[in-house]
Amino acid sequence: MAERPYDLVSTPEGVVARVRLRGSSVLVSSLLNRGTAFTLAEREALGLTGLLPEGVSTIEGQLRRVYGQYQRQPDDLAKNLYLAGLRDRNEVLFYRLLTEHISEMLPIVYTPTIGTAIERYSYEFGRPRGVFMSVDHPGQVETAFRNYGLGSQDVDLIIATDSEGILGIGDWGVGGIQIAMGKLAVYVAAAGLHPRRIIPVVLDAGTDNPALLAEEMYPGNRHPRVRGERYDELIDSYVSVATRMFPNALLHWEDFGAGNAHRILTKYAGNCLTFNDDIQGTAAVVLAAALGAVRAAGSRMRDQRVVIHGAGTAGIGIGDVLRQVMIAEGLSPDEATRCFYALGSKGLLTSDYPGTLRDFQVPYARPTAEVSGWPRDGEGRIGLAEVVARSRPTMLIGTSTQPGAFTEAIVTEMAAHVERPIIMPLSNPTSHSEARPADLIAWTQGRALIATGSPFEPVPYRGVSYQIAQANNALIFPGLGLGVTVCRARRVSDPMLAAAAAASSRPTGSARSHTTWYRRRRTGSSRLLNEARSVMPRTLSLTMAN
């Protein structure tokens, strides 16, 4: 195991970090380095005399400097790279800057800019972060974790991705470590989790992205993505080792492909503390948006007719949780299922669907007899326009990654039959959104209740500024992770997710107007943060080891 640069020690003044390192080694440790904020006494004790300019800064002074540097970056990718560099130098300053400007910087460290950073990973590769595990060496999983240098009680959360289904941009191989790092930053900034107690992991099974396979600078396995038994061996090894070495850690699954995400969650959910953000987190945040929208429309969930355009893991996960609410409101399971129309890559899911139905899609397939008179294209597909015209939905949800799929004709058809159409183009990044809020507002004469997956600027329309709600998983997963950690939960349950959704659905302050109808705030109450700090020491004080 790698030697730890510090020990956490309880003192009458609280928990402090007793530093083992000396000299320039302190300055290259991002978690210990405070740069010019080291006092003269700390510099002498840590062997830093002469290694820093003479002046001593406050963290407020450092914040002004780095925020100015950040603002001078020419574009969002440059800002993302600047923040990554700051994190590599001084994590205390990075997280202070991020928490001070969370609304401004969340789209930079997380969606949508993180998608561009992932695409550029081969060219912008710098300091390696996290743990890299290869399908070609599944026996090295334990060695990799040990080399990371954390003990069995030092880890609260492990964020793992195999990078097959990154956001809306697909397979990007080991570049997916960037999405794990982005999630880590949000867990810390929004919920107060300690960055050193979170491990980002990429499970490198290869890639089917031809651009990466041909790129000489690509740092991952340069072979086609491995599937089947060898892939399962890597996943089994990862789960077995992680749960044994870090028994209290929540295993967070991120951006796995449709063929594996549901299967992996189903396999391990009953045996360990595990959470799939794309399935459970997305479902919870969309449930929050849906509950708020239904409330704003003066209706009930059981009265909704829902079209889901994009019947993958996220879309069906959303359907599952909305369906459970309908059942809780009095519908039978069959009645609730009949409220949904889900479309895959080959149109409406039906009993005679022209493609292959995955197990999790089967419950949403409409009987062939029911749609026998509906027009189909030459390949036997029933398209979105026909589904909207025939089903007259009250709620239209997009998880298809097909930009512009919600056309003016489709939206006006929907709005002709419902007073307050609920429309959620959720695909990320922004370039993959099914519609632009400005168009949705114009096409519905300002009547639509809108939530998007990516951030959009307010929309002026007929003298009113419409604040666009973002159904961002960051409203759910940080607080969920904090709660699981504080109470030492053994499983992530459906009631936990329902409680998170209900809390996020309640409007506060400016969220009570126009298209923004549910909670937009930092996750985690001050009480929970205080409890978290009692079990997760924060590196706020330094002492020098003798």
Model-predicted regions and their roles:
Residues 28-32, 107, 177, 224, ...:
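Hydrophobic alpha-helical scaffolding
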Residues 2-272:
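N-terminal ligand-binding/catalytic initiation module
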Residues 197-198, 248-254, 300-304, 329-338, ...:
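Flexible, glycine/charged-enriched surface loops at secondary-structure junctions
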Residues 271-272, 276-395:
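Glycine-rich phosphate/diphosphate-binding loop of Rossmann-like nucleotide-binding domains
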Residues 144-146, 168-179, 210-217, 261-267, ...:
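Short acidic, glycine/serine/threonine-rich loops at helix termini
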Residues 379-446, 456, 488:
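Long hydrophobic segments that form regular secondary structure
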Residues 32-33, 275-281, 294-297, 421-539:
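Adenosine-phosphate binding glycine-rich loop
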Residues 127-129, 151-156, 194-198, 246-249, ...:
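Short coil/turn connectors at secondary-structure junctions
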